[in-house]
Swiss-Prot record:
Residues 11-21 have a biased composition (Basic residues). It is found in: Virion. This is Capsid protein. Disulfide bonds: none annotated. Residues 1-30 are annotated as: Disordered.
């Protein structure tokens, strides 16, 4: 055997896969498939038990449902005296509101405390009559009637309370974009005055896609 044949044989030997590598890869793929199936079943189970508007829960942000997008509204409450209230109706941008028959599936509130936040606030979403002026008296009654669960957000040394989100599922109600003006975000400042530089609320409204939604996040 000349030198060129010897070098070629050496390269061929080096190309041979190590024994057991193929079976190890197959075993890893099989384990991954099993894990994926288990996660899929778990997600389906959790989705089946997703709460309604009367029983919302705290969740992390997630991707929109197929065929849906979301529009975000940012609310910065004004100063709220200790023991007083603030209410703001959900008013979507005109470019979205004009498609008033598009269905809304979920509303999520995210509480974003600013560096000076040191209070305790209660936050909720309520369907309120068009005639309601969202006065302190009216909002107080809504918090007191127990008809809507409340997110209690308190100061946390880490900066953000572990549970800072509240999700409302409107799928069963067949609510649409036009209905959103009937809903309002309500805030109660429990222990002391809430200043204007302490808190921001992000309201994400998940709705069916509309022609302008190509520029909205998905």
């Amino acid at each position: 055997m000349d030198k060129s044949e010897s070098a070629s044989a050496g390269r061929n030997r080096r190309r041979r896969p190590r024994r057991g590598s193929r079976s190890a890869s197959s075993s890893s793929d099989a384990n991954f498939r099993v894990l994926s199936q288990q996660l899929s079943r778990l997600n389906k189970t959790l989705a089946a038990g997703r709460p309604t508007i009367n029983h919302p829960t705290f969740v992390g942000s997630e991707r929109c449902k197929p065929g849906y997008t979301f529009t975000s509204i940012t609310l910065k409450p004004p100063k709220i005296d200790r023991g007083s209230y603030y209410g703001k109706r959900l008013l979507l941008p005109d470019s979205v509101a004009e498609f008033d028959k598009k269905l809304v599936s979920r509303i999520q509130i995210r509480v974003n405390p600013l560096p000076k936040f040191d209070s305790t606030v209660w936050v909720t979403v309520r369907k309120v009559p068009a005639s309601s002026d969202l006065s302190v008296t009216a909002i107080s009654a809504m918090f007191a009637d127990g008809a809507s669960p409340v997110l209690v957000y308190q100061y946390a040394a880490s900066g953000i309370q572990a549970n800072n989100k509240l999700l409302y599922d409107l799928s069963a109600m067949r609510a649409d974009i036009g209905d959103m003006r009937k809903y309002a975000v309500l805030v109660y400042s429990k222990d002391d005055a809430l200043e204007t530089d302490e808190l921001v609320l992000h309201v994400d409204i998940e709705h069916q896609r509309i022609p302008t939604s190509r520029v909205l996040p998905v």
